[in-house]
Amino acid sequence: MKNDEMKKALEVVNSELKKAGISRRDAFKLAGLGGAAFLAGGTEVKASTVAKASEAKGKILIIGGGLAGISTAARLANSLTDPDITVIEPNPKSVSYQAGTTLLASGIYSSKDELVYETKDFLPKGVTLIKDKAVDFNPEANKVTLASGDILDYDFMIVAAGVVLDFGAIKGLEEIGEAYTNGDASKILKVFGNSGITSVYNIDSAEDMWKQTQAFIERAKSGEKLKAIFTAPNTAVKCGGAPKKVMYLVNSRLNEANARGNVDLTYYDNSDKLFSVKEYADAIEKQFIARDMKWNFNHNLVGVDISKKIAIFNKHWEEKGEYDKDLEEHEIVKKNQKVEVPFDFLHITPPQKAPDEIGKSEIGSDKGWIPVNKETLQHVKYSNIFALGDIAAVPMGKTGGTVRKQYKVLVDNLISVMEGKEPKEYFGGYTVCPLITDIGKVMLAEFDWTAKPTPSFPLDPTQERWIWWLMKVYMLKPMTMHGMLSGKA
């Protein structure tokens, strides 16, 4: 990734602003971006490098070479005078731009080639990359066994292996089994076929989603009355806004084709809210109502009958039971009901989990994630192990924006530990979700562990804005690929 991609993005932004009669300076001033030199094409990235490198020594092993792993490796390489860093990653294209899958699935990006990159092209100088998979962990002996049988030792370890897409947990999709966002999609595409079933969570299936969406729109244009449903599972997921983003974008494309009136759009969520932050949930509810998009809570997708085009949900709720005189309260009775919903178009957000070889290992937890102190990102049991990104057991936030805050904290804290000190930096739970609500509009949802909006800019964060669309579509990719993966943004 070269600076010319950032320049190209800025040229596109300038062109769009010019059409609106607004200068880039005025637009960024309006958006409160005056100090964000990186977005304005300035030198924030260069200025963010560590002023003085540490002379701390130690063999550092990083499990996972995606955005979190490579960004961390790069910042460590920039922060140590004599770094000894090895990254374990089986996928040669692990750094592909995952945040762009919703844009690919809606035809904003024309090809997956705009998202897929070779990991070796982003490997920091002096960092060793081993194309293999970690399958066994012995934290007491500081050793990791690879799929090849090789055993590596380490002084310090960082786990950034991401999540597995557990399609196989859904009845009817067992043949797919487990998949990865950047991984092989042959089983996904084979099982989905041309049934109208899609998922934005794999790059190849996201590309196929645009084909399925176009075919669906053509049917709607012909006058057919159709039903599209969008799901969110009963597990933590990466980019929790994606299930809603794709629904908004399908709605937008249907409106463009003057076919929206022939389609019923419904969102089925396992949870009981549209967003974890009330202010954003309220805003989304208003947006759904304005767009005639319906929603149902407490519905978990448990099965799909592909041939009959029926989605099967477990609807769950609680009721008051008998009154307990001793406790002076009613017993809470959990209820379940099987609900079958016919569809013409189905977007599946698969259940997600840490890879079993990690989540169920000695460094994992009962819930399968890597247990870390949510503020320091240090393992709760092993002080020489850290974790970040989707695999870390933090209360909320599995997005690239979360990683952008986490990896800087982790690097500083790891170096402190390497120097024999206590971790001194704290991650406050910052998460950002650029929620695409229309083609040309984004609501920039920023929040942290307070579960309150934490806007970086002096604008109402619950409002949909064109300037955030420009940032999402044109600026975030070069910032991620050029800035974060070099350990500087």
Residue ranges and their predicted role:
Residues M1-S23:
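N-terminal secretory signal peptides
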Residues K2-L10, S48-T128, N234-K278:
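Beta1-alpha1 glycine-rich phosphate/pyrophosphate-binding loop at the start
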Residues V403-F427:
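Internal hydrophobic alpha-helix adjacent to the cofactor/substrate pocket in enzyme cavities
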Residues D82, P124-D136, N251-K367:
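A Rossmann-like FAD-binding core segment of flavoenzymes
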Residues A56, L444-A489:
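C-terminal auxiliary extensions adjacent to catalytic cores
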Residues T86-P90, K227-P233, D264-D272, V341, ...:
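Extended hydrophobic secondary-structure segments that form protein cores and membrane-embedded regions
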Residues E175-S222, V339-K405, I415:
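FAD-site-proximal beta/loop scaffold in flavoenzymes
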Residues K18-G34, G41-K57, I130-K245, S252-N258, ...:
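FAD-binding core/adjacent interface of flavoenzyme oxidoreductases
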